[in-house]
Amino acid sequence: MPRGAQAMLEKQADSVWNQLYEICWNFYVKNVWDINTFKAIVDKIEKSDDKQLIRFLIWFNDARKRSNFNDKFQWMTSFLYGRRYPPLGDDLVVKEPWNDLQQLDSIIKYGNEPIDLVKMQPDFTTEERIVQNRRVNNCSLICSLTNAREENQIKSYSVHNVFNVILHFNGSNRLVSVLRDSNFPKCSKDGAALTLFSHNIEDMLIELAYFEIKNNRNYAYGGSNTATDTYLLTGWIPEILNLGDVSFSEIRKCYQFNAMLALGTDSVKGKEVTENHDFVVTSVNWKKEQFTILNPHGTENPTVYTWDDLIKEFKWLYVNWDPYSKYTQRVKLHDRYPDKFNAYPTWTQKPLMCIENKSNSIQNCHLYLERHLLDDSILESNLTIGEIPRSGFTAVSAEGNNSGFCNMQLRLNPHETRLIFYHSDKKCNLTFHLLSNSGLVSMSKCKSDILTAESSWNITNNQWTIGTSEYFKSPVFKLKSDGFDDTYLDFELVSQLPAKVNFQIFESDDYALQRPIFKNDTYSPQIFSKHGVRLLKGREYFIVCSIAHHITSPFIFTLRNPETKQSKFELSPYSLGFGGLRYNEVLRCKTRITISVSNFTRLFVLLFTSASKTNGRLTLRLYEKETEEILFEQIETRYDLSVKPFPIPNIELKPASYVLEIFYNADVVICNLGTSHRAIFESDL
């Protein structure tokens, strides 16, 4: 075939590849499916002799028919820095890149330093190993690449002038392509190279792909860690262990399965090794408890450390292990974590994951949580995973770090279900990887068994603590239950802003709030909880939520029933100061209030004073004005309305005029008056 004709066919094939890419992208990411466009591309491909193109078409046609949320989520999270990184492995060869590689070749940077972009050749002047360029802060990548090469875990292939490497991020294998003859940076000032040193040009291309993903092709990098970078290169599960918290036998147990090891130092000075630096573990002598360590700087020979010396010099052990050496099953579940989950510092407001063992045998599982990469890298942002307790609000376990991943080991009894909560300091996308040895172990999102009510403290209700006459003005909830037995509940009060908080529970006939069902007037920082509170059957309760300082803040009140036998509960706001009645009035009086009603109505009265101690004789009388029929009368020889409000609850009134007389040793008494229908009140002040 003439050379010109061959070039024309290749150009047409390239065009078909890109058209098929767009159809695929539109289907998964934009949720657009044009059957006519698809049929047209099928006709073109059927006339082609490109086996890879035909294979990709067959794969896509099958995949789209069985696609689910997870599949679409993996494609929707393929976008990074405005570029596409499809969830494809090395088993599905593509002939065209998904991004404009020529344009990418021009955006390489080294911070704000002036650089020249040049073609580079492998470095045959160094030893036959990968060596870090000290001007570039990527010791973790060099350690990871060294280990991955040794374990033959780099997945890559080349087509024409494109080098394709499979990296692992955003919950999937992902295709990253760079030009085989890519430009590389050199310092303009002294001509020094800014790439790693290796006999293999592909190591330099992998470094370029790494910086494309991690730092938008900027070689001025803040650094990472070997566990994270090894996962990026190989997909092997990462773990970071503090050497001070593990024993030599535990490390040996890690190594029983295919594993890659590296070490990291901290910022403590005065040690022999470089601070804040990662090192490769090239071998371990298990009998002598000796580790052979290699510095990625390449200026030192491998050094042998005993276990005792190792824990003195190094801080971190980075372990990456092959998931398929321990487990046969892998299930993934993707999720988004929005800011709203961080409104309150409690797991009760976090999303939950349910891990269930449906088999008849004990199952050992591993849960790995991965945070997705974003254009603006999330630095110093913690990711936390924990297990919800059977009762109460203290997590069974909760481990977190800022590495971008979390791990949890689970041992599930037959037919056991465990609930896991997860947290991120910042909004992000996440992927759960559940590893097990049974297809009967499943993972799903779920809802908690808690009941939550939300309210807020403001200038009208944040000034009265326990023991004050106006304590009832604090936010109040009324709790109802349809249970036929006594029950034990767990309660938690959480302020959104830092503040000292407390709640007390009273039976619903205790309008004066003098008999809490548990006595605890301590105010706790931001969270106040009580476990195993006994509530009697058939009773209703008031829950008063107060704050120690005059702070304006939203809060949540949470109820949890740990018992297997569930009852239904209703938690609703309640205006305790007015008996929960619709119409409210506050009057100041000396000795007399006149009440005029035109409909049958229910009356609630609450008397108190805001003055200092007023302990003395209190006489109350409510009577119909015309007939002088007494509806309520009570005398208290010693009563202090400045501490203990006095309630007159639920008096039924017919249409008429009434008089409420109050004899007390205070200049002014404040009266809260609640009615179910409108009424007219007149005070003698």
Swiss-Prot record:
Its EC number is 3.4.22.-. The keyword Hydrolase applies. Coiled coil: none annotated. The active site is at C139, H277, N295. Keywords: Hydrolase, Protease, Thiol protease. It is an enzyme of class 3 (hydrolase). The keyword Protease applies. One of its GO terms (biological process) is proteolysis. Residues 82-323 form the Calpain catalytic domain. GO terms for molecular function: cysteine-type endopeptidase activity. Belongs to the peptidase C2 family. PalB/RIM13 subfamily. Required for the proteolytic cleavage of the transcription factor RIM101 in response to alkaline ambient pH. This is Calpain-like protease palB/RIM13.
